[in-house]
Amino acid sequence: MESRYQPTAIEEKWQQTWAEVGIDQTPTDRSKPKFYALSMFPYPSGNLHMGHVRNYTITDVIARVRRMQGYRVLHPMGWDAFGLPAENAAIKRGIHPAKWTADNITQMRSELKRLGLSYDWNCELATCSPDYYRWTQWIFLQFYQAGLAYQKEAAVNWDPIDQTVLANEQVDSEGRSWRSGAKVERKLLRQWFLKITDYAEELLQDLDQLTGWPEKVRKLQANWIGKSTGAYLEFPIVGRDEKISVYTTRPDTVYGVSYVVLAPEHPLTLQVTTKKQLKAVKSFIQEVTAASEIERTAEDQPKRGIATGGKAINPFTGAEIPIWIADYVLYEYGTGAVMGVPAHDSRDFKFAQTYQLPIRQVIIPPDPDLNEQPILQEAYTEPGLLINSGEFDGMPSTDAKAAIVAKAEATGWGQARVQYRLRDWLISRQRYWGAPIPVIHCPQCGIVPVPEADLPVVLPDDVQFSGRGPSPLAQLESWVKVNCPTCNTPARRETDTMDTFIDSSWYYLRYPDAQNDQQVFDPAKTNDWLPVDQYVGGIEHAILHLLYSRFFTKVLRDRGLLNFDEPFQRLLTQGMVQGLTYTNPNRSDSSRYIPSNLVDPNDPKDPETGEPLEVSYQTMSKSKYNGVAPEEVINKYGADTARMFILFKAPPEKDLEWDDADVEGQFRFLNRVWRLVTQYPVIEPTTKQGDALAKEEKELRRAIHTAIKEITADLGEEYQLNTAVSELMKLSNALTDASCKDSVIYTEGIETLLLLLAPFAPHISEELWQQLGHTTSVHQQSWPQVDPSALIVDEITIVIQILGKTRGTIQVPASSSREELEEYARQTPVAQRYLEGKTIKKVIVVPGKLVNFVVADA
């Protein structure tokens, strides 16, 4: 046998062999239960990082274990390949996005294969391939036919550098683009939306089904959907026929309304403004609407407003109240107008103080001293009793909500309403590298969907990338001009492409039938494999990707393609991989991070200034100079060591701190396993199966089956992979220390160790399995089954105490009675020595643990 563990040679050998025999291909035999294991697919940026390695290794262990446990497993991989970085690369480097993306996919696929990940590459897909986005466009048409895709003019976040629309999530707290850093502007454009709000209630209610998801993720989605119960209330405008409609969750405070506020974009803003205020109001609106939504609503930003001079009437009090315009009110939310109740809303309180507006208290604490009502120093937002509220005085505020809404409905002043924070999904992007929206704009027919027979609408290759002006598609007249498929008159293609979240909202449905060129997928195949049994990915996708995927699943179900409600049964959100980070707090933000190769870890100082550095663990990134390239680790230690460290260092859901010493530790462990097997005696065992086992054989077999029991439990539904690796180490130690290496039990132990190790370190396990003389792959073996009888303990260790102090131990039969335990203890040399000449006052026996002699001096 090979005497040295040489991971590079072993790993290359087995990766090639596995590929040649197709060991990881998805089985078609439906007699076995199915298991769909899926990692969130990556954006092909060019190189794997340790976050990728962690995600994919976790999922790979799960897939490998389930195969050995008798499941037919689908474990695919693909590429979320559309997006801005490819187009930006085209602008900066003069390379076409398609080539940049294809080159990156080739590089990353090679790196994934080096990790020994058991993907069925026959299922591979890339969202930028016409073979894929043909069906993305087909799905868009399904939404359009169902009335779930529509176009309207909307205020959007506009990145003036990247020249594209940004989702709110792509704008930081300072109102800057997440990618270019440009100050985001507000701009009106005709945009395409998907009507996710039609599914808001179902998306909320079905969260209760997702018991296999982290509670944190479910709460994040529930908060994002943001269901609230309240009322629409109407405030007539003085001197006009119109009314201002507001939505409120606090109708119990309506008697405290001292002003109403309109969004700058509200259609009534100029109509309610007096001539005296008109110029100032127009200037204010122009200034405010240029700011991003994030800037306007940020908690730490002062709220700005302007009086219109107009008045409205509070129908409940009959009082005239001023109409204001403020930056924090957004037209896209609710009605685009809010009622100002400064006494009972913190934001309104600050606004009223700033602009010296009346503060009218209408709720007091439940047990107040009614004769003493001090001037409010802050808004009172808790439940209480109503005051200054007419017929509702003295009523608990929780009861007053329903009573006041009932009055509003009876008088025509308003009505009860359920509302959601969730808004329809804006999917238009003014970029090239995305799936074209399959729509034609005809001057005669209006919006005309591209016929299904004409799909895909393929991205043209002959485009120019300047990074300025309209999107490259809009500038290519030869592509834009087309005849209307309905009336044949000259028309124009839609030049917007789809948000890349569209591509990732259905990719998991395509994997079971990835090569199908006749339909989006065969419903029989997809309904057989779905829902995904275990989905693994980062917590950063808790809201958008996961919510959109749930939305797509429900729509395609309603279109008759799917027979399930939710796409992902279980979700594991793995923690971040963190690296040792050196920071000089006295430097500017752009240069505060110091590369680790320039720092002495024993005396961390700034190499230029000599200032002491702050040392911490932070998420690995290029900008922090704290990353570790997977390729470097694999080249030095092998993929199996990289996998073992990633799995051992921390529980999957927790952040992982990179530690070179622990990587070395895992390499040493695999070397011990290598020596353990390669030095395994080839002599015929002296004991046979069925022979009475000696004590040391029983102990070893107990260790073997304890490992099976514990590791199987760790790999159940909670995936405590770090403790599973610890159990592997315990078993290897037991085998190393065993004195019965010529026993059939030792043979069982060696083989069991390799079977249990195989999902974690697949290459070394396969090599050693073959060296033991097996001709079929270790990965095609059945998962070891625990023998309960092997766990039965024949002997136990009992502690002997004198006056509560431990003086020794004794091995006794596990079935010993109290009387027998006392007698065994009395007969030991240690007890006889300490009891000589003493009077035994009492004997305390704790079965399974100890015998304590309480003595007095003679």
From Swiss-Prot:
Catalytic activity annotation: tRNA(Leu) + L-leucine + ATP = L-leucyl-tRNA(Leu) + AMP + diphosphate
Native organism: Cyanothece sp. (strain PCC 7425 / ATCC 29141)
EC numbers, comma separated: 6.1.1.4
Motif mapping: 'KMSKS' region: 619-623
Binding sites annotated in the UniProt record for ATP: K622
Biased composition (Polar residues): 584-594
Keywords: Aminoacyl-tRNA synthetase, ATP-binding, Cytoplasm, Ligase, Nucleotide-binding, Protein biosynthesis
Stretches for region Disordered: 584-611
A GO molecular-function descriptor: leucine-tRNA ligase activity
GO biological process: leucyl-tRNA aminoacylation
Listed Pfam families: Anticodon_1 (PF08264), tRNA-synt_1 (PF00133), tRNA-synt_1_2 (PF13603), tRNA-synt_1g (PF09334)
EC top class, as a word: ligase
NCBIfam families (alphabetical): leuS_bact
Subcellular location: Cytoplasm
Signal peptide bounds: none
Family under the similarity heading: Belongs to the class-I aminoacyl-tRNA synthetase family.
Gene3D superfamilies: HUPs, Isoleucyl-tRNA Synthetase, Domain 1
Name listed for the protein in its UniProt record: Leucine--tRNA ligase
GO cellular component: cytosol
Source taxon at top rank: Bacteria
Motif 'HIGH' region positions after renumbering to this chain: 42-52
